[in-house]
Swiss-Prot record:
GO cellular component, one term: plasma membrane
Protein name: Uncharacterized transporter BF638R_1531
UniProt superkingdom: Bacteria
Keyword terms, alphabetized: Cell membrane, Membrane, Transmembrane, Transmembrane helix, Transport
Length: 565
């Protein structure tokens, strides 16, 4: 054991990976619905490892923190700038005011309790579950004209305050918005009804809307032998597909075997006759059962041997950006193609007829390869799987953003700047938006973005925990249980105020009120709790724009809280 401890002291990089290993493992453990979460677990494990008196030198903490902030900005950039448009301004304005609440309430409570700068920053970071504040506030503290000992004391107490307040910040947010929120809107049953009403308004009832599906409802391809007298002496392919449409079934004829010959490219005017074998594509629940009408299903491996494709496409074409799903679906190039999923700022949004598709959205198409490829060209840029990240783009974005963040102005003799960390966030916002406009460069595959986001943050948190380890226990004794109660207030008050503001001032639809509030507080856990409570995905429609604004402002508040104290 002594040998292992010695090696961890000599090679502190191993201590970091020990912290990540144990932290991620504990963070995945759930007791009922409760989980510490990865970030808190990594921090606490880092504190334990730090008891071994391990010193981590060098810029490793800052490097990974900058990668994390750039990834955050890159992910939400398109939605942040989209919010500046007229239709996004109400949600953007709501998010900005909500974020002010999230700053002012912790600041007032910190002043009342007599907290120092580090305790206030930790309170903000934990109660609002915005881990990046730890780094941004720390950078700002390091620029203050105070003694090195005081700087160290402030920086060491931040993770203590964060750890104490983060647990309620996460679990409490989910409870406030998932349980208390619907009551503030008139009761859970009323909110459920409002969500169903919005679904019906946007998609004529999603469950019955042909051609739309959740990811669990895949497109399928089945072959049938025509036996129905409806075909008479022959019906064109367009006649059959129109018949399906009239019966609320968005099905397509993909292939035909006629007189023993397979027709791979079926035109709308192709005539189908009794005895022909046809391949139909569409939602599984509509395709299965057609033997009751067309004729018996046939197992024909040769007829069914053709490439089908699931392809994510980034929407960039001005002709479709801003259009409703129903409008896009009706376009000629969407023949044979279904929309399986829409992701916006990394969040799944409901695929409903009236859902508006924005530039930068990732739309997942399903169908035969040639039809999907044709549709992809008309929608935007096919985001085909790749293992390559454009590191030129990443490096340049962080460099330019960091240089901008390093610029400072002096107010009352105090240098004020975004810091390199805030600059990296701004760089990510701009470069993420730029990539949505010009998707041929700047690609960061989703797994790589996950690494930058999660590993970047947790590597930073691990080093913070290890550094704070020796003073953590004493710091915890100083802040005590009272900080937990203060943190609960700092979490709950802005959320309750946000729900009431969204309802009475901004007059958002009840289905969007909770989603907008969760987004402004960037609490994905609460969004899941809301959707589970109201039994609908519609709250996600209010989440994305407010999430982009919240993720930006709440991180910048790490600078502001230090200056206010």
């Amino acid at each position: 054991m002594d040998w292992i401890v010695h090696q961890l002291r000599v090679h502190p990089e191993l201590a970091i990976f020990l912290t990540l290993f144990v932290g991620f493992w504990i963070g995945k453990i759930k007791i009922g619905k409760f989980s510490l979460g990865v970030v808190t677990s990594v921090l606490l494990v880092g504190v334990l490892v730090g008891q071994l008196d391990i010193t981590v030198d060098g810029p490793i903490k800052s490097v990974f923190f900058l990668l994390f902030l750039f990834a955050i900005g890159y992910k939400v950039g398109p939605q942040f700038f989209r919010g500046l448009k007229k239709d996004g301004l109400p949600q953007m304005g709501f998010a900005a005011i909500m974020c002010v609440f999230c700053l002012i309430i912790p600041w007032i409570l910190a002043k009342i309790m007599g907290y120092n700068v580090g305790e206030a920053a930790g309170l903000l970071a934990g109660s609002q579950t915005i881990s990046a504040v730890i780094g941004v506030a720390g950078d700002t503290i390091n620029e203050l004209n105070i003694s090195p000992e005081t700087k160290e004391a402030y920086n060491n107490i931040i993770p203590v305050s964060y750890a104490v307040t983060y647990i309620f910040g996460t679990a409490g947010s989910a409870w406030v918005l998932g349980s208390l929120g619907p009551r503030l809107l008139g009761g859970l049953d009323k909110v459920k009804a409002a969500c169903k009403e919005l679904e019906a308004k946007m998609g004529n009832n999603e469950a019955d809307q042909p051609g739309f599906m959740a990811a669990a409802r895949p497109v399928t391809f089945r072959a049938y032998k025509i036996a129905n007298e409806w075909f008479g002496d022959g019906k064109r392919v367009s006649d059959l597909e129109s018949y399906f449409q009239e019966n609320d079934k968005r099905l397509f004829v993909e292939r035909v075997r006629q007189a023993g010959v397979i027709v791979k490219e079926v035109s709308p005017t192709f005539v189908l006759k009794k005895g022909d074998e046809v391949v139909l594509s569409g939602r599984r629940e509509y395709v299965i059962g057609e033997e009751d009408w067309i004729g018996p299903e046939v197992l024909d491996p040769q007829l069914l041997d053709f490439p089908a494709e699931v392809l994510p496409v980034m929407v960039t074409r001005k002709t479709v950006a801003g259009e409703k799903v129903s409008t896009i679906r009706a376009l000629k190039f969407m023949h044979g193609v279904s929309i399986r999923r829409i992701k916006r700022a990394g969040i799944d949004i409901p695929v409903l007829a009236q859902t508006v598709v924005d530039a930068g959205d990732m739309v997942e198409l399903v169908g035969t390869k040639h039809e999907v490829d044709a549709a992809a060209k008309q929608l935007g840029y096919a985001d085909r799987p790749t293992n390559q990240t454009d590191m030129i783009f990443v490096g340049l974005g962080i460099l330019i953003g960091g240089l901008i963040g390093a610029l400072s102005i002096h107010m009352g003799g105090v240098p004020i700047s975004l810091s390199t960390s805030g600059g990296a966030l701004i760089g990510g916002l701009f470069f993420g938006w730029l990539r949505s406009k010009h998707p041929t460069f700047g690609r960061i595959p989703e797994p790589a973005l996950w690494i930058l986001d999660n590993v970047g943050l947790n590597m930073f948190i691990a080093v913070v925990g290890i550094a704070a380890g020796p003073s953590f226990v004493q710091g915890f004794k100083e802040v005590g249980l009272s900080l937990f109660i203060v943190g609960a207030l700092a979490t709950s008050i802005p959320l309750i105020a946000g729900v009431l503001m969204a309802k009475y001032i901004f007059k958002f639809h009840p289905a969007l009120v909770l989603g907008c509030t969760a987004g402004a507080r960037t609490t994905t856990a609460a969004l899941g709790a809301i959707q589970e409570a109201v039994e609908s995905e519609t709250p996600a429609l209010g989440y994305t724009v407010t999430y982009a604004v919240g993720n930006t402002l709440l991180i910048i508040w790490g600078v502001v809280i230090v200056l206010l104290m």
